[in-house]
């Protein structure tokens, strides 16, 4: 069902942006295996703020069976009201269900293996995760793709390249965005649509 929804969304995205006969998603352009990753944080500065949620979807291009990882992460400081309003993540949720950053990162690094990582905004997410990996004495050396960068090259001149805006143009349900796993689903669709438009991944 996930690939069916993806293909439908890519067709809609293609029509919206190109105003001509829609392109069918060419999933052969995608890596055979890749991991879509999204995080939620307490702010924008990786030197001051912390990860509070990690979501990842390990995609098998030639199968409809994908595996997911979802982890709430306990920060050292309380979550601001603004972040709770944006993500729906509360201090109570983190106290009850969150794990330490070391445990969360070890689980994440095991999950991703050496697969390509796909983010919507790679400089943001990857910087936070690289810094967190250093806390457990690890490095992230996986190849990286940025759906945001690909979208800017695929569809220049848009008013907004926010994930919800791009996904909404494709007719996707964006309710629940700003939670990590939901954003992974949206990112995967935008990534596939941009790859189809560009004729390649990057």
Model-derived features: where do they sit?
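Conserved non-catalytic scaffold segment of RNase H-like nuclease domains
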Residues: 13-17, 21-142, 156-160, 164-178
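Transmembrane helix interruption/hinge and helix-loop junction motifs
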Residues: 1-3
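Short Asp/Glu-rich motifs
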Residues: 103, 152, 186-187
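Conserved beta-strand -> loop -> alpha-helix junction used to position metal-binding or nucleic-acid-contacting
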Residues: 139-151
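Acidic two-metal-ion nuclease catalytic site recognized across multiple nuclease folds
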Residues: 6-12, 19-26, 169, 188-202
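A charged, well-structured terminal subsegment
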Residues: 174-196
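Short, glycine/acidic-enriched loop or turn micro-motifs at the edges of active sites
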Residues: 41-43, 149, 186
């Amino acid at each position: 069902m996930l690939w069916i929804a993806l293909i439908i969304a890519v067709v809609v995205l293609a029509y919206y942006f190109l105003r001509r006969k829609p392109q069918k998603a060419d999933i052969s352009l995608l890596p055979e295996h890749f991991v879509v990753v999204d995080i939620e944080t307490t702010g924008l500065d990786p030197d001051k703020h912390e990860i509070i949620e990690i979501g990842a979807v390990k995609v098998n291009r030639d199968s409809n069976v994908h595996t997911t990882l979802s982890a709430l992460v306990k920060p050292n400081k309380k979550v601001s009201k603004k972040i709770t309003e944006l993500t729906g993540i509360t201090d109570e949720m983190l106290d009850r269900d969150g794990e330490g950053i070391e445990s969360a990162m070890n689980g994440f690094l095991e999950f991703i293996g050496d697969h390509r990582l796909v983010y919507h905004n790679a400089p943001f997410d990857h910087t936070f995760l690289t810094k967190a990996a250093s806390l457990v004495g690890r490095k992230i050396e996986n190849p990286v793709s940025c759906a945001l960068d690909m979208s800017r090259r695929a569809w220049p001149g848009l008013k907004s390249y926010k994930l919800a805006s791009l996904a909404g143009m494709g007719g996707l349900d964006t309710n629940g965005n700003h939670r990590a796993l939901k954003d992974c689903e949206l990112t995967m669709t935008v990534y596939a649509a941009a790859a189809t438009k560009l004729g390649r991944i990057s």
